[in-house]
């Protein structure tokens, strides 16, 4: 491990809960539905996080607990059965239904695993009913995806086929591109998880090599390992270098000839570096402060430092899985300040004291920081944007240079007009 | 359990946050798990505020539940008071904290602070956002005024005359995340100033606890948003004898009535000419102008919060000459008033939380304009019907940069523009009517009605979505069938009435037991309904 300084902080936090993952998961698998068993707050949260109300019929909803549900648990189970039946009658196209646990459902101990089991036998294979927790008392923001994928793992068929499995939700175009590159390297059996249709689960077994595409899949990685799969240690595929090392980890494991790897990746790398150039000019030497939110903070900081020359003031992360992050931590410069957990007020004090040029933060904090004169970038944008892979490196850098560019644009205009 | 896809209102503690964030010098310690902090973005993103809401969340975790959560709450209260030095502290809990019963309000009160501490009990599993806001405002006002001398029998709203000063009133109810509150306050202030009435306190928006304490220095109260301020106004009336206005000045007629009411309350004479010309708003003339002829009898469907739908139905009916074909609200607290208003129009009010039920009702009543919330805007878009947004829940679109009140004279102007523009503008629609056989105006013509180009539900019914399947399957089996010739005749009808003609023709065919609709049936039906 590098000489990064690791600090733990506790206090008031300003981080989304795991329910928010539904916002991208429901788009990934159009035949799945996410039913939060929770409160009006949960419903309001997902609605607000989804931001614009653009969906005719969203593929998520909330079974809102009411006073009479709190009276007795048996009642709550009957109610849940009724809601699920109504929902499935209304939406016959649903193939997988996730019952998503929330803070209130966990505090009053509604056993969603048992509910899923019971409903599964009732629907007898027509719909698969799974459960996981997205509650704020158990999970942060992106951990919801970890929970959903983990719930899928027992359903994955076994296979002894030698194959590569990409784990974590990616934009379709990015995923296609990565698969194309692996095929050029002669790795033919490449599958991804979660699948684009919830019913088409990839297989898993002792000959499955797993590359994680997202850093927040700790539990999923563990249960995949339990099914015999091998998790290939690598940095995450963000930026040119991260993506190269990530692809090479697979290549090595599949015994791909190094010269083929070099000849395949070299042109992509050259092109990507060329595309990165204008953004590097913008970003280099600028001070970066990352507040904890998506778990992508460490790989992003690594890319922005290594390849774009940014100075790292602080990397906040909601929690740190040292094993999984080791390849990333190894690439960070000595004495990088990593803060696990959060005390949002103290952290904002440090932002003010350190005067970064760019702050990566959650949506609730962005405008107040802008009002104080800081340029900001929303963490949530990273989980929606196609940023993975060598070809996307310049797009990723652009996301961070845009706020700085905008800042300059508006300030220049103000100067000329006065 | 209630299945919700989209909701009109958040939980009650969001209402409390609206009050806290609207005010100065107030801090809210909210016992809530991680994730509930999402609420900050309602203020910083939707309202585009440059400050975080003054809220400290305890963000407890599962592992805290085994330990001493009460100590955790106290720690956060202590830190919040030290850091933010509020003049008054609100303490409450969100839905999950309610279940673990730490009673943070009592904990806070036991900590020996000098500042007023308002403990909020907002039952998250039975109440909603507006109720939470009203209750918070009421508790806050009550808490801050509890030591003020009560004088309900002595209060005389005309006392300003003998004291040789201008009358003064409080504006109660405007808050953040309320529909156009910021501009409504300015507009109402302007109108009152014009009539020589001073503003004592505006609350909660922009008020500090010190302002609340001098709330009873006013002669009367103006209840601008009953959803938020009615309970407070009633309490002030009972305890201090302050009368309050019941009319909400949205629309020309209501603004006039409002002025009448406040003049009467304060024992003032309303200037004569004001009463006669009735209006300083352009709405009246614009609505009378020949170009507005096309608005005659336009069928309009109204849904939103209580205050805005009541105002909208009056304006639509009395000031724009529309026909109201549907009226409803999600504000259960206002259900009775909305039911009464609907009854007067010969309608049954739709009181519901379910946006799909509203969408069904819109489809059923086949309006030409929908006045609703952002949810209805999306429903209307799917149905190809023009829509204007008149009510919360808030969307970034509802916080415009420009001055855009709903209340008063300028509010009436804004409403005229906002409602009429989504319909085609007068002359343009006349021309389309006159020249509808010209090739320019065939079905490909792009209108103002968005991507559907005014094709109404015709195209929509072909879309292979669940939503459409549901529509079709809900039709009874014996429903009359349109012959190709009937369909082609129907296609000649201008799109903006086509939906209505289709519906009427089917109704007529059903009545006379006709199974197939051709061109003749269509004409028969037209004659039947015109007769």
Swiss-Prot record, chain A:
Cofactor: [4Fe-4S] cluster
Any one biological process term the GO annotation gives: photosynthesis, dark reaction
Enzyme Commission code(s) on record: 1.3.7.7
Gene Ontology molecular function, alphabetical: 4 iron, 4 sulfur cluster binding; ATP binding; metal ion binding; oxidoreductase activity, acting on iron-sulfur proteins as donors; oxidoreductase activity, acting on the CH-CH group of donors, iron-sulfur protein as acceptor
Assigned keywords, A-Z: 4Fe-4S, ATP-binding, Chlorophyll biosynthesis, Iron, Iron-sulfur, Metal-binding, Nucleotide-binding, Oxidoreductase, Photosynthesis
Cofactor notes: Binds 1 [4Fe-4S] cluster per heterodimer. The cluster is bound at the heterodimer interface by residues from both subunits.
Reactions accelerated catalytically: chlorophyllide a + oxidized 2[4Fe-4S]-[ferredoxin] + 2 ADP + 2 phosphate = protochlorophyllide a + reduced 2[4Fe-4S]-[ferredoxin] + 2 ATP + 2 H2O
InterPro entries cross-referenced by the UniProt entry: LIPOR_BchN/ChlN, Nase/OxRdtase_comp1, Protochl_reductN
Superkingdom, natural source: Bacteria
Pathway(s) the chain acts in: Porphyrin-containing compound metabolism; chlorophyll biosynthesis (light-independent)
Enzyme class of the recorded protein, top EC level: oxidoreductase
Annotated binding of [4Fe-4S] cluster, by residue: 17, 42, 103
Subunit structure as annotated in this protein's UniProt entry: Protochlorophyllide reductase is composed of three subunits; ChlL, ChlN and ChlB. Forms a heterotetramer of two ChlB and two ChlN subunits.
Family stated for the protein in its record: Belongs to the BchN/ChlN family.
PANTHER family, per the entry: LIGHT-INDEPENDENT PROTOCHLOROPHYLLIDE REDUCTASE SUBUNIT N
Described purpose of this protein according to its UniProt entry: Component of the dark-operative protochlorophyllide reductase (DPOR) that uses Mg-ATP and reduced ferredoxin to reduce ring D of protochlorophyllide (Pchlide) to form chlorophyllide a (Chlide). This reaction is light-independent. The NB-protein (ChlN-ChlB) is the catalytic component of the complex.
Protein name per Swiss-Prot or TrEMBL: Light-independent protochlorophyllide reductase subunit N
Organism: Prochlorococcus marinus (strain MIT 9211)
Lineage: Bacteria, Bacillati, Cyanobacteriota, Cyanophyceae, Synechococcales
Curated annotation (Swiss-Prot), chain B:
Superkingdom, taxonomy of origin: Bacteria
Keywords per UniProt: 4Fe-4S, ATP-binding, Chlorophyll biosynthesis, Iron, Iron-sulfur, Metal-binding, Nucleotide-binding, Oxidoreductase, Photosynthesis
Enzymatic reactions: chlorophyllide a + oxidized 2[4Fe-4S]-[ferredoxin] + 2 ADP + 2 phosphate = protochlorophyllide a + reduced 2[4Fe-4S]-[ferredoxin] + 2 ATP + 2 H2O
One Gene Ontology molecular-function label: metal ion binding
Iron is among the record's keywords: yes
Binding site for [4Fe-4S] cluster: 36
Annotated cofactor note: Binds 1 [4Fe-4S] cluster per heterodimer. The cluster is bound at the heterodimer interface by residues from both subunits.
Catalytic activity, EC: 1.3.7.7
Presence of the UniProt keyword Metal-binding in the record: yes
Binding site for substrate: 426-427
EC class of the enzyme, as a word: oxidoreductase
Swiss-Prot/TrEMBL cofactor(s): [4Fe-4S] cluster
Pathway(s) it belongs to: Porphyrin-containing compound metabolism; chlorophyll biosynthesis (light-independent)
Active site residues per record: 291 (proton donor)
GO terms under biological process: light-independent chlorophyll biosynthetic process; photosynthesis, dark reaction
Family, similarity comment: Belongs to the ChlB/BchB/BchZ family.
Role, per record: Component of the dark-operative protochlorophyllide reductase (DPOR) that uses Mg-ATP and reduced ferredoxin to reduce ring D of protochlorophyllide (Pchlide) to form chlorophyllide a (Chlide). This reaction is light-independent. The NB-protein (ChlN-ChlB) is the catalytic component of the complex.
Assembly and binders: Protochlorophyllide reductase is composed of three subunits; ChlL, ChlN and ChlB. Forms a heterotetramer of two ChlB and two ChlN subunits.
Name of the protein in its database record: Light-independent protochlorophyllide reductase subunit B
């Amino acid at each position: 491990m590098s000489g990064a300084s690791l600090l733990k902080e506790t206090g008031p936090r300003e981080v989304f809960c795991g329910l928010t993952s539904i916002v991208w998961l429901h788009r990934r698998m159009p035949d799945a539905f996410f039913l939060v068993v929770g409160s009006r707050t949960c419903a309001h949260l997902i609605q607000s996080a989804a931001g614009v109300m653009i969906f005719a019929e969203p593929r998520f909803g909330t079974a809102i607990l009411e006073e009479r549900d709190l009276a007795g648990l048996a009642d709550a189970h009957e109610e849940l059965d009724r809601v699920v039946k109504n929902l499935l009658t209304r939406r016959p196209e649903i193939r997988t239904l996730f019952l998503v646990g929330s803070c209130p459902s966990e505090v009053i101990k509604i056993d969603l695993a048992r509910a899923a089991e019971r409903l599964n036998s009732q629907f007898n294979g027509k719909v698969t009913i799974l459960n996981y927790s997205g509650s704020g008392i158990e999970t942060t923001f992106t951990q919801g995806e970890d929970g959903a994928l983990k719930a899928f793992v027992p359903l994955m068929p076994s296979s002894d086929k030698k194959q590569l499995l990409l784990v974590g939700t990616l934009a379709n175009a990015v995923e296609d591109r990565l698969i194309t590159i692996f095929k050029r390297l002669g790795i033919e059996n490449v599958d991804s998880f979660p699948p684009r249709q919830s019913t088409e689960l990839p297989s898993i077994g002792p000959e499955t090599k797993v590359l994680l595409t997202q850093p927040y899949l700790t539990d999923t990685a563990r249960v995949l390992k339990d099914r015999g799969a091998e998790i290939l240690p690598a940095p995450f595929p963000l930026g040119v270098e991260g993506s190269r090392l990530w692809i090479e980890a697979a290549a090595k494991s599949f015994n791909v000839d190094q010269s083929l790897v070099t000849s395949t990746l070299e042109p992509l790398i050259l092109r990507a570096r060329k595309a990165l150039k204008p953004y590097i000019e913008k970003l280099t030497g600028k001070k970066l402060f990352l507040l904890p939110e998506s778990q992508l903070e460490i790989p992003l900081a690594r890319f922005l430092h290594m390849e774009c020359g940014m100075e790292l003031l602080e990397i906040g992360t909601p929690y740190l899985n040292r094993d999984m992050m080791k390849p990333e931590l190894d690439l960070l410069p000595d004495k990088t300040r990593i803060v696990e957990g959060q005390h949002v007020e103290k952290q904002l004090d440090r932002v003010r004291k350190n005067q970064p040029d760019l702050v990566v933060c959650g949506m609730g904090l962005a405008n107040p920081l802008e009002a104080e004169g800081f340029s900001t970038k929303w963490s949530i944008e990273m989980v929606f944007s196609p940023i993975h892979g060598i070809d996307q490196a310049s797009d990723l850098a652009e996301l961070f240079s845009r706020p700085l560019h905008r800042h300059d644009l508006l300030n220049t205009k103000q100067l000329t007009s006065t | 359990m209630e299945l919700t896809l989209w909701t009109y209102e958040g939980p009650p503690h969001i209402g409390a946050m609206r009050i806290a964030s609207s005010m100065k010098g107030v801090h809210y310690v909210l016992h809530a798990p991680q994730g509930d902090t999402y609420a900050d973005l309602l203020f910083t993103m939707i309202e585009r505020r440059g400050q975080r809401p003054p809220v400290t969340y305890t963000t407890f975790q599962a592992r805290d539940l085994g330990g001493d959560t009460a100590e955790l709450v106290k720690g956060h209260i202590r830190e919040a008071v030290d850091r933010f030095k509020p003049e008054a502290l609100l303490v409450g809990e969100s839905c999950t904290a309610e279940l673990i019963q730490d009673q943070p309000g009592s904990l806070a009160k036991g900590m020996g602070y000098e500042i007023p501490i308002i403990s909020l009990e907002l039952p998250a599993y039975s109440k909603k956002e507006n109720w939470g806001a009203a209750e918070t405002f009421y508790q806050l006002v009550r808490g801050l005024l509890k030591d003020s001398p009560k004088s309900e029998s002595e209060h005389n709203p005309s006392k300003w005359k003998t004291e040789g000063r201008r009358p003064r009133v409080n504006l109660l109810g405007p808050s953040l995340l309320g529909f156009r509150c910021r501009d409504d306050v300015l507009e109402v202030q302007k109108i009152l100033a014009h009539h020589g009435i001073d503003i004592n306190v505006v609350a909660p928006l922009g008020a500090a606890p010190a302002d609340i304490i001098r709330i009873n220095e006013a002669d009367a109260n103006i209840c601008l948003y009953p959803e938020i301020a009615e309970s407070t106004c009633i309490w002030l009336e009972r305890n201090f004898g302050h009368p309050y206005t019941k009319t909400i000045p949205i629309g020309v007629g209501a603004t006039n009535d409002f002025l009448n009411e406040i003049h009467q309350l304060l024992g003032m004479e309303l200037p004569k000419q004001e009463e006669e010309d009735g209006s300083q708003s352009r709405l009246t003339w614009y609505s009378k102008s020949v170009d507005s002829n096309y608005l005659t009898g336009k069928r309009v469907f109204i849904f939103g919060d209580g205050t805005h739908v009541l105002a909208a139905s009056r304006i639509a009916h009395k000031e724009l000459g529309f026909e109201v074909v549907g009226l409803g609200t999600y504000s259960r607290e206002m259900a009775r008033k909305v039911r009464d208003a609907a009854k007067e129009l010969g309608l049954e009010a739709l009181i519901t939380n379910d946006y799909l039920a509203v969408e069904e009702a819109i489809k059923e009543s086949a309006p030409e304009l929908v006045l609703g919330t952002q949810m209805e805007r999306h429903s209307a878009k799917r149905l190809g019907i023009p829509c204007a947004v008149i009510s919360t829940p808030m969307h970034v679109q509802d916080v415009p940069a420009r001055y855009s009140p709903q209340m008063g004279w300028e509010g009436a102007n804004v409403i005229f523009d906002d409602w009429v523009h989504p319909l085609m503008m007068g002359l343009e629609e006349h021309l389309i009517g006159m020249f509808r056989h010209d090739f320019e105006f065939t079905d490909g013509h792009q209108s103002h009605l968005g991507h559907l180009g005014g094709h109404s539900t015709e195209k929509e019914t072909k879309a292979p979505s669940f939503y459409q399947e549901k529509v079709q399957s809900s039709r009874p089996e014996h429903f009359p069938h349109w012959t190709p010739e009937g369909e082609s005749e129907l296609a000649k009808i201008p799109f903006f009435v086509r939906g209505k003609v289709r519906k009427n023709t089917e109704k007529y065919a059903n009545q006379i037991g006709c199974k197939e609709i051709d061109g003749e049936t269509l004409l028969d039906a037209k004659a039947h309904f015109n007769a």
